[in-house]
Amino acid sequence: MDKGKKVETVEKQENSLPWVEKYRPTTLDEVAGHEGVITTIKKFVEEGKLPHLLFHGPPGTGKTTTIIAVARQIYGKNYRNMILELNASDERGIDVVRDQIKTFASTRQIFSSGFKLVILDEADAMTNAAQNALRRIIEKYSAHTRFCILANYTHKLNPALLSRCTRFRFSPLKEDAIKHRLAHVIEQESVDLSPEAFQSLLHLSSGDMRRALNVLQACYASVDAGEQISEELVYDCVGSPRPADIRTVLQAVLDGSWESALHTFSYIKQSKGLALADMLTAFAVEFQKLDLQNKTRIALLDGLSEIEWRLSSGGNESIQTSATIGVIKQSMELEASS
């Protein structure tokens, strides 16, 4: 292949990549946040004493990125041949453990020294039988294979499996860490983002870097060249209610009649394409900002959680919309009577 064409092909592939992959850190120094965790893992790698690892925490907090950076540091360019990466939520049965993992763990790489690495993502989705089989394989092949288990929830993992790993908690990323990374991507991709949209993106990411980058890319793809990304577009891409819309609904519920409140509520819900479940969460956030008595706050949250439960159980959304108005009006009457 002509050298010029090859360079052009590589650039084209990079441009077509999701930004989550395109800007994924390749070294431990580039990983955002979790300074304490990264420092400890660096020490393990430098001393050549990497134990079996368990990274747990919410999605988008850097679990996969960190272990891939570890693999790159240990194996260099050869890292793809020395790791087995599986998503346990897709392949969660005992056959995967018996076949793929056991086969990989039991064979040595020719011309390669040191241990191999098995990365098991979303391991909390594995069946109990598969987890028990994995525990036995970890015991048997520890001499030349290391295991890194990634999970959102540790309570779904076998205690015997947990005891064989060194655990690290990946908390939701702090706003500053996400802000720094987003600013880098915005500069590299020449994204025109309003200050209000940037703040909304930080707020809606809720400590999830993956979500922040995916929403940013979706917004960028939605606008014409040179057009600025607005705060409203960010909320539309996420599918979350805008705070201004939530305040409008609350004002209508508190000030108007039942009919006008229901009309305003239904209009905003339908015109913005919002789900009532998302609006309930937004109401709860908005009520946290108000100076309410404890008993009022309890009544509100108790009522909203009851409606959320009914929705998840298949309740009619129109009826639950009316019920939401009732909960808010009743709670505010309780506040006024005290």
From Swiss-Prot:
<dbReference type="Pfam" id="PF00004">
    <property type="entry name" value="AAA"/>
</dbReference>
<keyword id="KW-0539">Nucleus</keyword>
<comment type="function">
    <text>The elongation of primed DNA templates by DNA polymerase delta and epsilon requires the action of the accessory proteins proliferating cell nuclear antigen (PCNA) and activator 1. Subunit 3 binds ATP.</text>
</comment>
<dbReference type="InterPro" id="IPR008921">
    <property type="entry name" value="DNA_pol3_clamp-load_cplx_C"/>
</dbReference>
<feature type="binding site">
    <location>
        <begin position="57"/>
        <end position="64"/>
    </location>
    <ligand>
        <name>ATP</name>
    </ligand>
</feature>
<protein>
    <recommendedName>
        <fullName>Replication factor C subunit 3</fullName>
    </recommendedName>
</protein>
<dbReference type="GO" id="GO:0003677">
    <property type="term" value="F:DNA binding"/>
</dbReference>
<dbReference type="GO" id="GO:0005663">
    <property type="term" value="C:DNA replication factor C complex"/>
</dbReference>
<comment type="similarity">
    <text>Belongs to the activator 1 small subunits family.</text>
</comment>
<keyword id="KW-0547">Nucleotide-binding</keyword>
<dbReference type="InterPro" id="IPR013748">
    <property type="entry name" value="Rep_factorC_C"/>
</dbReference>
<dbReference type="GO" id="GO:0006271">
    <property type="term" value="P:DNA strand elongation involved in DNA replication"/>
</dbReference>
<keyword id="KW-0235">DNA replication</keyword>
<keyword id="KW-0227">DNA damage</keyword>
<dbReference type="InterPro" id="IPR003593">
    <property type="entry name" value="AAA+_ATPase"/>
</dbReference>
<dbReference type="InterPro" id="IPR027417">
    <property type="entry name" value="P-loop_NTPase"/>
</dbReference>
<dbReference type="GO" id="GO:0031390">
    <property type="term" value="C:Ctf18 RFC-like complex"/>
</dbReference>
<dbReference type="GO" id="GO:0031389">
    <property type="term" value="C:Rad17 RFC-like complex"/>
</dbReference>
<dbReference type="InterPro" id="IPR050238">
    <property type="entry name" value="DNA_Rep/Repair_Clamp_Loader"/>
</dbReference>
<dbReference type="GO" id="GO:0006281">
    <property type="term" value="P:DNA repair"/>
</dbReference>
<dbReference type="GO" id="GO:0016887">
    <property type="term" value="F:ATP hydrolysis activity"/>
</dbReference>
<dbReference type="Pfam" id="PF08542">
    <property type="entry name" value="Rep_fac_C"/>
</dbReference>
<dbReference type="GO" id="GO:0005524">
    <property type="term" value="F:ATP binding"/>
</dbReference>
<dbReference type="GO" id="GO:0031391">
    <property type="term" value="C:Elg1 RFC-like complex"/>
</dbReference>
<keyword id="KW-0067">ATP-binding</keyword>
<dbReference type="InterPro" id="IPR003959">
    <property type="entry name" value="ATPase_AAA_core"/>
</dbReference>
<dbReference type="InterPro" id="IPR047854">
    <property type="entry name" value="RFC_lid"/>
</dbReference>
<comment type="subunit">
    <text>Heteropentamer of subunits RFC1, RFC2, RFC3, RFC4 and RFC5 that forms a complex with PCNA in the presence of ATP.</text>
</comment>
<dbReference type="GO" id="GO:0003689">
    <property type="term" value="F:DNA clamp loader activity"/>
</dbReference>
